[in-house]
Amino acid sequence: MMSSYSTRRTFFAFIATLAFSLAPATAQDARRGYVPPARDTVRAVAADHGMMVAQERFSAQVGADILRRGGNAVDAAVATGFAMAVTYPRAGNIGGGGFMVIHSADRNEDITIDYRETAPAATTPQIFLGADGKPDATKSRDSALGVGVPGTVAGLALALDKYGSGQFTLAQLLAPAIALARDGFIVSDDIADTLPSWHRRLARWPSSAKIFSRPDGTPLVEGDRLVQGDLAETLSAVAALGPRGFYEGEVAEKLAKAVTDAGGIMTPADLKAYRPVIRAPVRGTYRGYDIVSMPLPSSGGVVLLETLNILEGFQLADLKQGSPASLHLLIEAMKRAYADRARYLGDPAFVNAPIETLIAKDYAAKLRAGISAERATPSKELVSASAAPREGSNTTHFSVVDGRGNAVSNTYTLNFSYGVGLVADGTGVLLNNELDDFTAAVGASNAYGLVGFEANLPGPGKRPLSSMSPTIVLKDGKPVLVTGSPGGSRIISTVLQVIVNVLDYKMDVAAAVATPRLHHQWLPDEVRVERGFPDDVLLALKAMGHLIVEPMGQTSANSILVTPSGLLGAADPRTRGAEAAGQ
């Protein structure tokens, strides 16, 4: 156990440096909008012994420090996951949930941990309908009815218990997060830019306003210090008692009271009953590589594999990356897989989805046969039904690889930025509005335009369908690429394009991440595109019948490529403050 006085002293000096000395590095006038850099100007960060890539620099350094001190990829992931609850409050969390994919080199095993939020026991299929029987989006998005039972604390603790190195206790891995919450850190330009848009939402509750506001009631600005004393106490309770410090006792009582006082239905019994689930990953192959991703209740792995299977029948390498012909095939493959997502997928505890059929090569061949090389297929010709719920894009993803070949791909979320906006008084915990990912009614869409069917209706104890797609690509049983992204429904298409860019087009991982992306999710029948595609390419896609819409929306595919000569980390340049930290 690494617990000597000198190790602790060095460690807390490191945290103090993070909290007090790291100033935002991005210029204010370069903040707004993503303009893809020239491909020859982006560079991956190289390392020999370990790599952490995360959407926020303080937390990336926390994970890298754990690797430096002999921890494995899971140890580092747990430390970073808790730290991001402090330093990246719009998505990092202990009041939400997510998914983790682990490759254990020591055990030659691939596993996943589902720590998705669950619906409280009092949830009914009609909970998000108005008096007229139609979906009322304000109930799931803007009220405490949308709060699901958080899973992050239980999920991260389970990962450490089952797959950590054994060199660190949970309390040791929580120490960086506790220090950052207690002592505070300098507000970054990213936090300062997002707060004005969400401050009115946060300010509905005094418990939230007092944390994210200046004394005059205006949002914190870049250079202010964000101190979260109550959150430090909550994290300390978890350090002392493990998950019981969150799911039982004083913290649980405060969480439940905050929700019920705000009109929600989560109770202390719901919190005590929460359990994360270890699941076998969904697996497939693409161009001779093994793709390991998240199974249901995340749709990510299934839709990703279905899309890759469709594309495998086309020789994409013979088409120029970013050409109209290659992009058309990507769009058409996405369209078909997302249509199946809406029709079939939901919580596996409640829905018997035809997964083996959906990820079968022969099924992909049938779908591929319906793709014209010259003409866009109207979405209405694929399935005669309505679309799936819109998911929150304010998720966050980090990737980790250690020197022994262990790898972690982790995506977690509050759904919207800052979740529902409610900090449970006395806990510092920002609560999610994740239940908006359920289908409020058959055919209704959620906040991100995804349409759903009966499989994803709300129900007690049920986990809402997700698009989170933490993924590890293997060759001969060893990690080659670790990737994932935030972005709601755009997560799957983002991960898809990173994989295709690396495996088909042999792009450097930094360029594969930075290059412009597009997205189609079946309904609405439109192609969302980032800036950076040449006008002639967009005109050619329009001529094929594609409706082109800008912008695509935020994604951040923080990725690691494992090469014979070492590790290459690519922090997505779309996110200010993202960092690849190697050692």
Residue ranges and their predicted role:
Residues Q28-Q61, A73-L241, F246-E248, E253-S299, ...:
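Noncatalytic scaffold domains of N-terminal-nucleophile
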Residues F12-A23:
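Bacterial N-terminal signal peptides
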Residues I66-L67, A154-K162, L241-E248, E253, ...:
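Alpha-helical support elements that line or immediately flank enzyme active sites
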Residues A441, K462, D504-M552:
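Extended C-terminal subregions enriched in glycine
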Residues M1-F14:
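Bacterial N-terminal signal peptides that target proteins for export
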Residues V86-T112, I265-T267, N406-K475, Y505, ...:
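Active-site rim segments in enzyme catalytic domains, especially the processed small/beta chain
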Residues G92-N93, G97-S104, T396-V400, P470-I472, ...:
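Short beta-strand scaffold segments in enzyme catalytic cores
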Residues S207, S213, G313-L414, V423-T427, ...:
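Internal maturation/activation junctions in enzymes
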